[in-house]
Amino acid sequence: MSGEIERSQEVAVIFAQDTDHKAQYEALAKLCNKYLPQNAMGRVDTAEIIKIIDTVIALETGSMVVSRQFVSLITERLDNQHLESECVKAISEGILAIIKTRTISYEDQVCILRLMLASLYEKEGRIKDAAQALIAINSDTSPKFNGPQAAKEGAKAQLCIRITKLLLDCSEIDEAEQYVNRTSILMVDLGANPDIQIEHKALQARVSDAKRRFVEAAQRYYELSATEQLPNSDKLTALGKAIVCVLLAKPGPQRSRLLTLIFKDERAPKCASFELIAKMYLTKVIHKDELEEFEHQLQDHQKADEHGESILKGVIQEHNITAISQLYINISFKTLGQLLGVDTEAAESMAGEMISSERLHGYIDQTNGILHFEDSNPMRVWDSQILSTLEQINKVSDMIVARHSEFAEFLT
């Protein structure tokens, strides 16, 4: 306690002895040298430094010119790789706590301290704390993120990108989406900056993937795989992720279009899951043992939906029903269940849901427990209807000839 009083008195004397801001700052800088010299190494007395800063800010009234300069000096000296990170962290957190209610007067210093803390937290694996440190920066008013040079470098967009990455890494997906959307707005003013654009596209894909919007994610990953600036290895990685997402996506026109694009892409056979893409595109039955390797590639959010149901299992079962419809005119639900690896009731429920949503053409004979398939190809349906009509005409003609033999001469 006596040390704190002594330090407070020392700072008070500096302010009392001279009213000149320059002289006050120089005297405080000398005091700072005792506890936090330039190029300091190892540990420093964090408690003393924080007390000095607290006293300086508390005693100075009016313009706060000296206290701002002094906090800037401390901030500069904290940016020193030879200082123990725990000391840097403690002093930075201490300063932020002291000026919490006066942040607007120390915006530049606060910004630098938060950036410093974010890097330290990230190294320690405190990903969420790192994200929160960056989120607390007011990039709209902070000098570091405004002005011609900051605009040219896309400083605000880069900050949002960094925040998005951290939020994704700590599974704060909804908040990550907010920042990826904010980056999209900033990109309009930023113009063509290929590096930032690529990072942004990759994060858009990751957010869509994490939100289980797999068709959208597949589309973004595929676009990324065609980006000229990326090395071939990164292009293939993006293509592989597009394949994973399209395999997990629900059926629909956009998914069908992506399946076609990927299947016909000459790079696709180099990807691990190409055989599954081929079977899905060609509407062939996919067996359980063919999925083992693919399942190992899946991330946690790709394995189950929000209800805990397997995403892959549902998609593959639906695909297999469609594939079976190409092989059978009709099938019992018992046999269908055996082919799908589910019980009879589940097979009937799946088929019924697909028919009701027009993802499968057919009808259910509940009395006999049979699923009847109808051809969804309009030309084949048209041909079938013509053939059926002609067969009926022939049948009627034969019946007429059987009763009235003279009609045969008319037909010939």
UniProtKB/Swiss-Prot annotation:
Q: Give the GO cellular component terms, alphabetically.
A: COP9 signalosome; cytoplasm; nucleus
Where in or outside the cell it occurs: the entry states:
Cytoplasm; Nucleus
GO terms for biological process? cell cycle switching; oogenesis; regulation of oogenesis
The protein's predominant localisation is cytoplasm
Establish whether keyword Cytoplasm is in the entry.
Answer: yes
Keyword terms, alphabetized: Cytoplasm, Developmental protein, Differentiation, Nucleus, Oogenesis, Signalosome
Q: Which Pfam families match?
A: PCI, PSMD12-CSN4_N
Q: Which residues form a coiled coil?
A: none
Recorded superkingdom: Eukaryota
Q: What InterPro entries does the database record attribute to this sequence?
A: PCI_dom (IPR000717), PSMD12-CSN4-like_N (IPR054559), PSMD12/CSN4 (IPR040134), WH-like_DNA-bd_sf (IPR036388), WH_DNA-bd_sf (IPR036390)
Q: Which SMART domains match?
A: PINT
Per UniProt, residues of the PCI domain are 216-378
Family according to the record? Belongs to the CSN4 family.
Please give the function described in this protein's UniProt entry. Component of the COP9 signalosome complex (CSN), a complex involved in various cellular and developmental processes. The CSN complex is an essential regulator of the ubiquitin (Ubl) conjugation pathway by mediating the deneddylation of the cullin subunits of the SCF-type E3 ligase complexes, leading to decrease the Ubl ligase activity of SCF. The CSN complex plays an essential role in embryogenesis and oogenesis and is required to regulate microtubule stability in the early embryo. Mediates mei-3/katanin targeting for degradation at the meiosis to mitosis transition via deneddylation of cul-3.
Subunit comment: Component of the CSN complex, probably composed of csn-1, csn-2, csn-3, csn-4, csn-5, csn-6 and csn-7. Within the complex it probably interacts directly with csn-2 and csn-4. In the complex, it probably interacts directly with csn-1, csn-2, csn-3 and csn-6. Interacts with itself.
Q: What is this protein called?
A: COP9 signalosome complex subunit 4
